[in-house]
């Protein structure tokens, strides 16, 4: 069988000095007028004619076509598939597309039979000259076209979907004509097109016919964790990624080595170039593992930027074996679509991985106090580098034996960063821009012995001067100060200086990166811990991880204050030390510099003084809504019930500021997806836009077997036509093992899916979204 599209692509890639491999089960005949391949036989098809049936190349309409002349005999062309190809078609579906016109008669039959069954549409011109279709095993005819349109060229499509009740849908010029067509019994084993009857004459001209089997393998198990993006500037260029798992395990096991691999297609996912290892150049001695490739396609530069995590080879996120002092981090590589070149990996760990001492005053208070010998008759200065994560009562205090100065930091209801100063009634708004509210800031107190006042500076900018309050205390303290008010703060530095001498110095940024041999316990370092109720404190973060799936480039931020169109952003998994959460990592300059947003707001409840009941969002994906909001869907690992509320295996969150902060969408969890697997697994979400500008969301996840039960089987596809409020479907895409998946728009009609299937083999599905959509919208009418 000649794979015409494969050969064309191979020739093009050879011109660029690139290798290619033929994966796609795509069988076609194309009447190009090429003298070398001008007949079906020369393109690999078997002639199956009887009596006077024949075929000939014609240019009668000014374009080449193969004229099927079933006059006085059958005139059809066939190709027989292998057992493996039949099995693949049964498990992953197939699509048959024909561009032809019927000139006279009937019994024009373009179909596929797998040895046990077939779906057989019969195209004819009826006695009134109308173009009609009927289906084997079903009654009635459907008129497709009348008048002169009946004998013009049209597109006929059959789309077969697998499942417990497999069926096909028939489309005419892109419109759904018949759904849920059940196969009929047949012993034939072939793809067939032409006039299929020796007793009924029929003449048709074929410009093109394609038969495509879904589910070609592009990465083989034990490799895992697929992701995929497609270029919108250079149509047809698709880049796929996975973890190369030599040894077969998750990262962080001595028994295996993990790297990041990629393959590229330049014909929409039909053929793929050879596998390329992106990380072996920075992993020559196999001392690290790399995981979770997260690509972002940037249309402004026509590049793909893929981020991935680095781990020590003996510890990673799973099992919380990774520790803050271990060499976890994030790297990225850039692929230039036009040239086909990859840049060397770039390390951005210092930009995105936080090193700090973290205090969560959730249900209690936790302060650290250090007695000092400040002299109120001399100037002094304190510096603190702090990030306010949430809540209030987050405090810095300096007392010099005469007066004390207290700065209490909080996030107010509007999301702004606010300071309250002791002895001053009015709060001070320090920052209202969300991107800066949740960042680390330098808080400096400068005491004037002459005036007995202190001036507050934030990031070097003078904010105010105040007198504080009379106090005989002589100390410095920080933490969450009120057991009745929740708050979380992260500290990187505390320094107290007088007369050029550091009286107190706490370098949490440094200590968070040190091994246990270095003393880090604040109480052993001279601090007094003052704790009430339930709190949590730790050095972190242990790890940051891009997670599986693709990231996005923002394009709909016109309605958002501080428009950030062009922002590259993805949801990353962060492990503080004990719990997983998700935060956005983003770049506003094409990837040169990266910042982090806040973590997802999650409910919690202390079950005891040492057991915190909360959610742990992990693998997540996001999509930009039409109004500029970002919708994030996250897998919930481990616990799913907090304070009696079942949040299910999946929860959605919303951002109204370009991914900086998030809100939990009540009751918007896995339950909005009917017949979804109850197991935890990575999913995928994306936006799809048609050529007419209409748009909707797509979501893929296993359904389970049967649907709605626990298990990684039977990948489903859901549609949302109201920006993620409700979801229609699922449409089953895979029959059998289905784990992680990623879906991305390929063109104005199709999306491409990569999914883990049997034995972790990662397969490609090229799905006709505009056709499948009609299966749902038709049922609503």
Curated annotation (Swiss-Prot):
Q: Which domain of life is it from?
A: Bacteria
Upregulating conditions: May be controlled by sialic acid availability and a growth-phase-dependent mechanism.
State the reactions this protein catalyses. Answer: Hydrolysis of alpha-(2->3)-, alpha-(2->6)-, alpha-(2->8)- glycosidic linkages of terminal sialic acid residues in oligosaccharides, glycoproteins, glycolipids, colominic acid and synthetic substrates
EC number(s) per UniProt?
Answer: 3.2.1.18
- Name of the featured protein: Sialidase
For the keyword Hydrolase, the answer is yes
The record's keywords, sorted A to Z, are:
Calcium, Glycosidase, Hydrolase, Repeat, Secreted, Signal
GO terms, biological process:
ganglioside catabolic process; oligosaccharide catabolic process
Q: What class of enzyme is it?
A: hydrolase
Q: What is the lineage of its organism?
A: Bacteria, Pseudomonadati, Pseudomonadota, Gammaproteobacteria, Vibrionales
Whichever gene encodes this chain, its name is nanH
Give the record's subunit note: Monomer.
Active site, UniProt feature: 250, 619, 740
Residue positions annotated to bind substrate are: 224, 635, 712
Pfam (any one): Sial-lect-inser
